[in-house]
């Protein structure tokens, strides 16, 4: 009996070891890139005295996650690994997504003029402001320039032009594009569906749309935002993020027309070369992307940059999301610079393939 028990135990252990070995072999994570991305993020968090941060690097065509880095600091101690990649909050990266929806209507294009005035736009009882309102605003600019300078007013006025007084049609289009997906990812615990306040909700108000289209009135995780940006890089094909190697799963074969996608890709590259995204500019490879900052309910901030490279033939999409208490905050100077450092590291690995 004891001999039989030993054999059963040995087989069980061997089976567990085989399964563990299989999981290790099938992991999509590049261990070298994971270490380098961790070092880059930790250095930036320390430099700006941030509370926590996340970096996720995805392979454009397959959705394979090549690095998944999370760091947090408690009680002013050293930064420690954090595995909560399901955390959701408002995002400063909504402007391009709203613009893509507007482009899909065919009623606006990047060269259209939009007057943002002195940087303050009254909507019912609230004021929508651009970041430079205290310097007199941008005046009349193009839709493309509005994206490059992260103009909240340009984004909302573009939505008004595209959708008129029918915000529900905007939300219907976002749903058609699968914004906020996926709802679950193998290997990421507790990921929930993104939460949006829409005209169908009791929380809806006359100002809700203006703030939604720039990233508020919603809760979304960085990896869900990354999934949408990756679809832009992938010419409209949205694929499921994967932490374990498997066949590529397509969420949406074409989130928007190729013409709209191409227009947005030009705008995202312009945002880095000529807009507020310049800190993400790399002299090693052309990049495209968007920076953003969102203020949270506890008066802390999330600063982000999401983009892809090479811009003309995207191989990787990267999101950098940093949580920081107190000013100053800057999506471009903080998250964008981190993005650039990661791009430079990835570029070196690409040229050695």
Where are these regions (language model features)?
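C-terminal motif of bacterial Sec signal peptides marking the signal peptidase cleavage site
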Residues: 14-15
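Short amphipathic alpha-helical signal-transduction/dimerization elements
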Residues: 233, 272, 340-347
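Short amphipathic alpha-helical face segments that pack within enzyme cores
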Residues: 92-101, 222-227, 334-341
């Amino acid at each position: 009996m004891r001999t039989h028990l030993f054999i059963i135990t040995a087989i069980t252990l061997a089976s567990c070891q085989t399964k563990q070995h299989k999981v290790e072999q099938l992991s999509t994570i590049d261990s070298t890139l994971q270490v380098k991305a961790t070092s880059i993020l930790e250095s930036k968090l320390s430099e700006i005295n941030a509370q926590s941060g996340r970096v996720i690097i995805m392979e454009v065509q397959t959705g394979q996650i090549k690095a998944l880095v999370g760091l947090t600091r408690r009680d002013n101690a050293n930064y420690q690994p954090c595995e909560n990649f399901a955390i959701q909050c408002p995002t400063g990266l909504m402007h391009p997504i709203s613009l893509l929806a507007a482009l899909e209507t065919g009623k606006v294009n990047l060269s259209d003029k939009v007057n943002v005035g002195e940087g303050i736009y009254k909507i019912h009882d609230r004021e929508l402001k651009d970041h430079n309102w205290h310097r007199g605003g941008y005046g009349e600019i193009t839709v493309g320039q509005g994206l490059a300078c992260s103009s909240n007013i340009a984004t909302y006025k573009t939505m008004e032009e595209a959708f008129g007084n029918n915000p529900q049609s905007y939300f219907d289009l976002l749903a058609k594009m699968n914004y906020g997906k996926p709802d679950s990812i193998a290997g990421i615990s507790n990921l929930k569906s993104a939460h949006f306040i829409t005209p169908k909700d009791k929380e809806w108000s006359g100002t809700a749309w203006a703030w939604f289209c720039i990233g508020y009135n919603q809760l979304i995780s960085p990896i869900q935002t990354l999934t949408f940006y990756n679809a832009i890089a992938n010419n409209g094909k949205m694929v499921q993020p994967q932490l374990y190697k498997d066949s590529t799963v397509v969420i949406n074969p074409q989130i928007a027309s190729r013409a709209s996608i191409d227009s947005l890709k030009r705008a995202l590259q312009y945002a880095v070369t000529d807009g507020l995204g310049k800190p993400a500019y790399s002299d090693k490879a052309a990049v495209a992307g968007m920076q953003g900052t969102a203020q949270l309910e506890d008066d802390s901030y999330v600063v982000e940059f999401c983009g892809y490279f090479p811009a003309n033939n995207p191989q990787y999409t990267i999101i950098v999301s940093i949580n920081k208490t107190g000013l100053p905050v800057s999506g471009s100077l903080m998250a964008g610079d981190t993005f650039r450092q990661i791009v430079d590291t990835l570029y070196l690995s690409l040229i050695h393939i």
